[in-house]
Amino acid sequence: MKLTVLVGGVGGARFLLGAQRLLGLGQFATPDDNARHELTAVVNIGDDAWIHGLRICPDLDTCMYTLGGGVDPQRGWGHRDETWHAKEELARYGVQPDWFQLGDRDLATHLVRTQMLRAGYPLAQITTALCDRWQPGATLLPVSNDRCETHVVVTDPTDQQQRAIHFQEWWVRYRAELPTHSFAFIGTETASATTEVTAAIADADVVMLAPSNPVVSIGAILAVPGIRAALRATRAPIIGYSPIIAGKPVRGMADACLSVIGVDTTAEAVGRHYGARAATGVLDYWLVAEGDQAEIDSVTVRSIPLLMSDPEATAQMVRAGLELAGVTV
């Protein structure tokens, strides 16, 4: 079976880990596995930024580190056993920004990526090269090789004027607490999905939307030209997972993002925001948490346990989605 999943960062990476657990891939593979299954992740790049002259791709790296067994288990991002000597020395020099943490081990990834970008390699090819070191057991595809950054229009606390700041500054520095007016996906007017991504969607047996942030993760992927068309054209069933349980995001600040675009923080509202593929949206199936309700025209809805407490629990989420779509593994 070919499974293609649209993902963001920490939550998306954990969802992929559960898919690997179910399919016997990556760190869950055994000598008896005969590669019957393929897992491909279409990864958000809206969080990507230039920091200290280096190209940072947080969601790609979080997926790569998580599936490769090297992620920091407490934070859910960055390297295990990280050190911070470079960050401390930069602070002594007074270098800005001082609110974005880059660990010493993590810096190596960004240095390699930046060198390859400056040598003319596309991001998809660079990601493949980086994954050679980590062996994630899945194909990780940036949604585009082009610049597609999420920026946020806020009220500047210094002069009370509206201005756009990078998503990372809004999310990390200000913790999404500034008065916020809108999101802008910079670069999407000239960007396009890679041919590898559109092929992964077209050739999939099943497509899933992970329970990542519906605005700045999945939403940023959907904003890239070519993605919606590929989803609407694929013969594969499309199964979405709610990131909202009992009116609250499982992690992160999805509620702040949803509020900005005028969508309620409920499983039903997020499902309606994605919309039915039978109409103008992208969903065939929508899974919500036990106790949550959702009615979405032309979308089949089922309630299941949705807490990704460990890979086995997440594997059962993936299994439930496949069963709902009539797919067995």
From Swiss-Prot:
It comes from the Bacteria. 7,8-didemethyl-8-hydroxy-5-deazariboflavin binds at residue 61. Coiled coil: none annotated. Keywords: Magnesium, Transferase. Homodimer. Belongs to the CofD family. It comes from Mycobacterium ulcerans (strain Agy99). PANTHER family: 2-PHOSPHO-L-LACTATE TRANSFERASE. Catalyzes the transfer of the phosphoenolpyruvate moiety from enoylpyruvoyl-2-diphospho-5'-guanosine (EPPG) to 7,8-didemethyl-8-hydroxy-5-deazariboflavin (FO) with the formation of dehydro coenzyme F420-0 and GMP. Its cofactor is Mg(2+). InterPro entries: CofD, CofD-like_dom_sf, FbiA/CofD. This is Phosphoenolpyruvate transferase.
